[in-house]
Amino acid sequence: MAELACFCYPHLENDSYKFIPFNSLAIKCMLTAKVDKKDQDKFYNSIIYGIAPPPQFKKRYNTNDNSRGMNYETSMFNKVAMLVCEALNSIKVTQSDVASVLSKVVSVRHLENLVLRRENHQDVLFHSKELLLKSVLIAVGHSKEIETTATAEGGEIVFQNAAFTMWRLTYLEHKLMPILDQNFIEYKITVNEDKPVLESHVKELIAELRWQYNKFAVITHGKGHYRVVKYSSVANHADRVYATFKSNNKNGNMLEFNLLDQRIIWQNWYAFTSSMKQGNTLDVCKRLLFQKMKRESNPFKGLSTDRKMDEVSQVGI
C-alpha cells in the first residue's frame, strides 16, 4: 500500500491541478536528504532532478534499510506513476480537493496489474482508454463505482459464471512490490455487473468455493469484491484493512465499507468488519476472528450434494 503522493505531485494550471510523475533519481535524492521535522510533509525539491515525494513517505520505498517498500528504480514504477497521472489528469482536481486525493492509500499491486492489463493486446483495457482510466480511478478510490470484472485488476481467471469471475492473483511475478513468499496463493472474486445477483448464481459460486477452495476463507476489503485467502493470512489482512479504514477516515476519505453478501463471506470476517465499522479497537475486532461463531441458518442447505466427492480440491493443502 502507498499514498498517491508517492507517485506524483500536483502543478497548478489555471484553476485546477495537473499531475506530474516522479522520477527515480529525485526519489533517491529525497531518501538521502536530511529534512527538518516541520518539512516532512512537504514535497521535496531535489534541485537537480526535480520534485520528489514528501520525506514522511520514505518507508514506502525499497532501500538498504527497508526491503518492504516499492522497487522505485524499476521501469514498472515509471509505468504506474504515468498511469496514475493519466487518470488524475482526466478529471478536474481543485485546490480544495488536491490534499485529499494525494493522501489516498492505494494498492501498489493493483496498479501494477492494471499496467499489465493495459499492455496485453488481448485485453479489453488495451483497446479502450476510457475503460482503462475508469479502472484506475476506481483503484485509487476516486470513483464511487465498485471494481467489476471489466475494471478489475486482473490475474488468471479460474472460475466464471453469469454473475461472478474469480481470479488467481499473480503477485509473485510483480516487479514493483512482489510477494516474496513462494507459498503465496490468493484469489479475488469480482461481480460481472454492479446489479442484484440471482440466488442460483450465488449458489453456483458457493458450491465452487466449498468444494474447490475449502482451505480458504472468503473475506472482503470493503471495496465491492471478495478475496479468497488462506486462513493463516486472515489476521494479516485484518491488520491491513483496519489500518486503511482508519487512515481513510482520518484523512476525510470517508468511503463506504461494503460488507457484501453475508452468505458468501466467512462468518468471522463479517463479524470483524461489522465491529470495525462500529468504531471498536483493533484488538476488540480481531478477537472476533478467533471466536467460535453460532452457525447461521444455511440458505443453501444440501448444497454439497451438487458435487461428487472426487471433485473435492486439494488446493491449499
Curated annotation (Swiss-Prot):
Keyword list, A-Z: ATP-binding, Host cytoplasm, Hydrolase, Magnesium, Metal-binding, Nucleotide-binding, RNA-binding
Q: Which Gene3D superfamilies match?
A: Rotavirus NSP2 fragment, C-terminal domain, Rotavirus NSP2 fragment, N-terminal domain
Give the first-level EC class, as a single word: hydrolase
Q: Respond yes or no to whether keyword Metal-binding is given for this record.
A: yes
GO BP annotations listed: viral genome replication
Q: Source organism's superkingdom?
A: Viruses
Write out the catalytic residues in the record: 225 (for ntpase and rtpase activities)
Q: Where in the cell is it found?
A: Host cytoplasm
Question: GO terms for molecular function, please?
Answer: ATP binding; metal ion binding; nucleoside diphosphate kinase activity; ribonucleoside triphosphate phosphatase activity; RNA binding
EC numbers, comma separated: 3.6.4.-
Checking InterPro entries in the record gives: Rota_NS35_C, Rota_NS35_N, Rotavirus_NSP2, Rotavirus_NSP2_C, Rotavirus_NSP2_N
Q: Where is this region: RNA-binding?
A: 205-241
**Listed GO cellular component terms?**
host cell cytoplasm
Give residues annotated as binding ATP: 107-109, 188, 221-223, 227
Q: Under what name is this protein listed? A: Non-structural protein 2
